[in-house]
Regions:
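A structural motif corresponding to the C-terminal lobe/cap of the Radical SAM core domain
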Residues: 293-296, 308-424, 436, 457
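Proteins enriched for Cys/Gly/acidic motifs involved in redox and nucleic-acid/cofactor modification
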Residues: 2-245, 283, 320-331, 355, ...
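Short flexible coil/turn linkers enriched for glycine and charged/polar residues
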Residues: 183-186, 196-198, 294, 304, ...
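Conserved SAM/AdoMet-binding glycine-rich loop
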Residues: 112-117, 124-126, 229-351
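Terminal RNA-binding accessory module
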Residues: 2, 7-14, 384-478
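Conserved, mostly hydrophobic/aromatic
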Residues: 200, 220, 237, 272, ...
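Glycine-centered loop/turn positions within well-structured domains
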Residues: 148, 198, 243, 307-308, ...
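Thr-Gly-centered strand-to-loop micro-motif
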Residues: 118, 369, 448-449
Length: 478
């Protein structure tokens, strides 16, 4: 059995602390002769779970491996297999454990294959212990704060054939000039910040992603300029809380100022994810309204319509404050589309508090929504709360919430019928490969007949029919 070397392990106490000693690095990734020789003729495969930030991490990991000389494989029959994981909910973790188990057969066929687990899940010590105890075929575990150590870690595995665990509790660098293999040739994710300082009581992200750290504005703008010059049609600015961007600079830098500078680059489409209502200022609303190339789509997670539950969640706003923000957004941004996240079954949520959430849904008239039953996360304050809400009641409330949401989502889709919208074509429809699919500026999915040569282009599509979560259209002047 291979020896396991523990380089660093996550510490929940350290993860709660806000380390402010990080710095900026512009050093390029170095690839050793050992790794480049090993990579010749070998392949890699990455399976990513979770949010857009994880997919951006995949692009960087892929870029590092490509720089070393590895070729990208289309399936798990590869020489390096990496699972890039998500820890937001238990269901996501269960999927990862299932996949790790499946990889045992791959390892049996190719004993020299290197199986690695990275991402948010392994920022938790109990997850690392479970992997080491049960899944003996895993060779490498590394965290969210040391992706760029991957070449050195692979060097050691190749030379020593050891297992390695290297998961740091806190970040120390914001690294620029990283290699990247983009997942799309026309849509791009651009990190503007990392981490979160909000510490909502149910959320694991501040522990797995660390303190809020903003990239320098000029570095972000340079990346966006390069994407514009390369012909990208859409750029999404990413952060766990984008509208807290710049708070760590102490020089008056704000997300609104960054967003305006990005808009001036004339990239056809600009989006951003994700916003926290507490930091959503009127200055930001005005910038969105001002520029046509900033999509009139805002993801504004409410989580609950009850002020009492919001307080228990540590969300920092009341139900009335959220409603005032929605009213302000709709008054200033014409034809804005709103989406949200909602959690039902938070510990001790009463029926009356749940009814307040249903009332919020009726008030906000969301165009789309992501709904979840509360999932306890290890070491978070909410996980330690007593909970008298039964599983059956949580499930019932979830179904009732979805039914209420579908009313506004369906109404939003039906209101688009007969109108023409600009759609960025993403590819063949997953439901019917004889059709194309793409998204409107308001992030509505549209299926329509058209030639594959239109992929990556923005076209005019008239909506002729609606379903709750998608639309049917016909190409104009196609």
């Amino acid at each position: 059995m291979a020896k396991c070397e523990f380089k660093s392990l996550p510490d929940a106490k350290l993860q709660r602390q806000r380390n402010t000693s990080f710095s900026f690095s512009y050093d390029e990734i170095n690839i050793s002769e050992t790794l480049s020789n090993y990579a010749k003729g070998k392949t890699y495969y990455i399976h990513t779970y979770g949010c857009q930030a994880n997919y951006r991490d995949e692009e960087i990991i892929s870029g590092i491996l490509a720089k070393a000389g590895f070729l990208k494989a289309s399936d798990e029959n590869a020489d390096i297999i990496i699972l890039n994981t998500c820890a937001v909910r238990e269901n996501a973790e269960d999927k990862v454990f299932g996949k790790i188990g499946e990889l045992k057969a791959i390892k049996a066929k190719n004993k020299n294959a290197i199986i690695a687990i990275c991402g948010c899940m392994v920022q938790q010590i109990h997850i690392i212990n479970k992997i080491l105890d049960i899944y003996k075929h895993v060779d490498l575990i590394f965290g969210t704060h040391n992706i760029t150590d991957l070449p050195k870690l692979l060097d050691e595995i190749i030379l020593k054939r050891n297992k390695i665990v290297d998961v740091k509790s806190q970040p120390s660098l914001i690294e620029e000039n990283l290699p990247s293999t983009r997942l799309s040739s026309f849509k791009a994710f651009v990190n503007i910040s990392y981490g979160c300082d909000k510490f909502c009581t149910y959320c694991i992200v501040p522990y797995t992603r660390g303190k809020e750290r903003s990239r320098k504005m000029e570095d972000i703008l340079n990346e966006c300029r390069e994407l514009k010059e390369a012909g990208y049609q859409e750029v999404t600015l990413l952060g766990q809380n984008v509208n807290a961007y710049g708070k760590d600079f102490k020089d008056g830098t704000t997300f609104a100022k960054l967003l305006e500078e990005v808009a001036k680059l004339n990239i056809p489409r600009i989006r951003f994810l994700t916003s926290h209502p507490w930091d959503f200022k009127e200055e930001m609303i005005d910038v969105i309204a001002k520029y046509d190339n900033i999509m009139k789509y805002i993801h504004l997670p409410v989580q609950s319509g009850s002020s009492e539950i919001l307080k228990l969640m540590g969300r920092r706003y009341t139900s009335d404050q959220y409603k005032q923000l929605v009213t302000l957004i709709r008054s200033k941004i014409k034809d804005v589309y709103l989406s949200t996240d909602i959690i039902v079954g938070f510990p001790n949520e009463t029926e009356e508090q749940f009814q307040e959430t249903l009332e919020m849904v009726k008030f906000a008239q969301y165009d789309s929504a992501f709904t979840f039953i509360y999932s306890p996360r290890n070491n978070t304050p909410a996980a330690k709360m007593t909970d008298n809400v039964t599983r059956e009641e949580k499930s019932s409330r979830f179904k009732r919430l979805v039914a209420e949401l579908e009313k506004s989502v369906s109404a939003s889709s039906m209101a688009m019928v007969g109108k023409t919208f600009k759609v960025l074509v993403e590819g063949a429809s997953e439901k019917d490969n004889s059709m194309l699919s793409g998204y409107t500026e308001g992030n509505k999915l549209v299926h329509f007949k058209g030639d594959l040569s239109l992929v990556g282009k923005i076209v005019d599509v008239k909506i002729i029919a609606s379903h709750t979560y998608s639309l049917i259209g016909e190409l104009i002047n196609g």
